[in-house]
């Protein structure tokens, strides 16, 4: 469970770790009940909802030994989500002006307003996504490195969505991502030693370099009678380049299997553009809170947790972010069926609406403690209490004492 502006958000998921697509339709082959098993593939099904306002469903498949001979990885995923209109402080006509002024350096204005109905089923944004990926283990610099290429397509469908730059129409996002990663940890749930490293670049085609449109003078005035038509044309195919770096290191503070472990983490992300007048309104960073992906006060954003702060309070449409964590873990139970550990942490991070303001040393800090539990067929669950030391941003309360619920493994 998590918490959004419209109440409790529930999530349910199933994960089959020894799935066999080959045995799915075979008779008399290896099964666990009705589940075909034996090939080490992973099938995941999940859903999130808070009832009326938000629903999301996803299905993913992973084959770590694609072809059966070499450790080549094949992945496929499909997802659908729908968010209906809510009364949100972050989406008002003042917000359009503030956000649009940010895009082109024209100043800023207040983003707070309460003028919309709390719920309207005729206002919505829908997202449909599909992706295919292929990865390969590398032999250099060592065999712990892997490289993955993934093709992704997302279609955004908006109707009467008066909380955004575009209220009606369809937007398309086709991108190719390249990911270099290395993992030397001894296990997934409670690593004692080793590190995880990831560097990725995702890029769309640079449509604005050849389509001949004058983006400087296209959809640059929200109050214009032709704004929505121009915005649909401007963002029919969105463009960007997105850079990610993530690193975690684990150090055992003892020689026994059940010993404390110190985890350190540093990560950052940057969302760039090819044309300063066509910055992507999608794929931005939603920073603060528990970091649960999916339902946020925004949509089509990458959710970054920062414990001790309200969800999205650091940034709801940031173009760069950084985060650092120092976390001490202590095992309470490490069994095959169920594992539990307690933790205490110091954390800091921030997000910026301009890449030029990016500064990893400019941090909003927090501290706290929590617990994690790993359950079969369910995965990772957790709860944290944290205190954000920067309680206010201007007059808005963003930090202080916070409880956060965690679902799913995070890197």
Model regions and ranges:
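C-terminal beta-signal and terminal closure region of outer-membrane beta-barrel proteins
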Residues: 292-298, 356-411
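Gram-negative/organellar outer-membrane beta-barrel architecture
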Residues: 1-190, 196, 386-411
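Short secondary-structure boundary/capping segments
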Residues: 91-94, 281-283, 359
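Secondary-structure transition into beta-strands, especially the periplasmic turns and strand N-termini
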Residues: 69, 138-145, 254-260, 335-337, ...
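Short Gly/Pro-enriched loop/turn and capping motifs at secondary-structure junctions
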Residues: 83, 333, 349-351, 376-378, ...
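Small/polar glycine-rich anion-binding or flexible loop at a beta-alpha turn
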Residues: 342-347, 362, 366
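C-terminal outer-membrane beta-barrel translocator/porin domains of Gram-negative envelope proteins
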Residues: 1-6, 15, 159-332, 337, ...
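Short, glycine/acidic-rich beta->alpha junctions
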Residues: 53, 126, 172, 239, ...
């Amino acid at each position: 469970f998590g918490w959004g502006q419209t109440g409790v958000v529930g999530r349910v998921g199933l994960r089959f770790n020894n799935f066999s697509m080959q045995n799915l339709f075979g008779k008399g082959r290896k099964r666990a009940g009705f589940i075909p098993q034996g090939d080490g593939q992973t099938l995941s099904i999940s859903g999130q909802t808070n009832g009326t306002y938000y629903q999301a469903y996803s299905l993913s498949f992973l084959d770590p030994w694609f072809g059966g001979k070499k450790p080549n990885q094949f992945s496929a995923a499909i997802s659908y989500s729908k968010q209906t209109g809510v009364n949100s402080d972050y989406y008002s006509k003042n917000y359009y002006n503030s956000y649009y002024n940010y895009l082109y350096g024209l100043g800023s204005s207040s983003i707070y307003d309460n003028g919309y109905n709390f719920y309207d089923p005729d206002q919505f944004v829908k997202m449909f996504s599909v992706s295919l990926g292929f990865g390969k283990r590398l032999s250099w610099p060592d065999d712990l490195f892997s490289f993955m290429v993934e093709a992704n397509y997302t279609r955004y469908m908006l109707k009467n969505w008066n909380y955004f730059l575009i209220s009606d129409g369809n937007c398309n996002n086709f991108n190719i991502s390249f990911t270099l990663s290395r993992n030397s940890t001894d296990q997934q749930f409670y690593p004692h030693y080793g590190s995880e490293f990831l560097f990725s670049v995702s890029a769309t085609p640079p449509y604005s370099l050849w389509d001949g449109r004058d983006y400087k003078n296209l959809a640059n005035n929200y109050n214009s009678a032709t704004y929505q038509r121009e915005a649909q044309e401007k963002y029919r195919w969105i463009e960007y380049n997105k850079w990610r770096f993530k690193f975690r290191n684990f150090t055992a503070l003892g020689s026994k299997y059940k010993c404390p472990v110190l985890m350190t983490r540093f990560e950052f992300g940057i969302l760039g553009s090819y044309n300063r007048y066509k910055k992507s309104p999608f794929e931005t960073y939603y920073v603060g809170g528990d970091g649960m992906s999916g339902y946020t006060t925004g949509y089509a954003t990458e959710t970054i947790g920062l414990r001790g702060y309200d969800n999205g309070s650091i940034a709801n449409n940031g173009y760069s972010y950084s985060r650092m964590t120092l976390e001490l873990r202590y095992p309470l139970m490490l069994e095959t069926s169920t594992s539990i550990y307690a933790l205490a942490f110091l954390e800091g991070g921030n997000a910026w609406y301009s890449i030029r303001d990016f500064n990893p040393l400019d941090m909003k800090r927090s501290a706290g403690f929590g617990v994690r539990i790993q359950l079969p067929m369910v995965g990772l669950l957790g709860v944290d209490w944290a205190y954000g030391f920067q309680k206010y941003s201007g007059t808005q309360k963003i930090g202080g004492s916070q409880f956060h619920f965690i679902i799913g493994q995070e890197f």
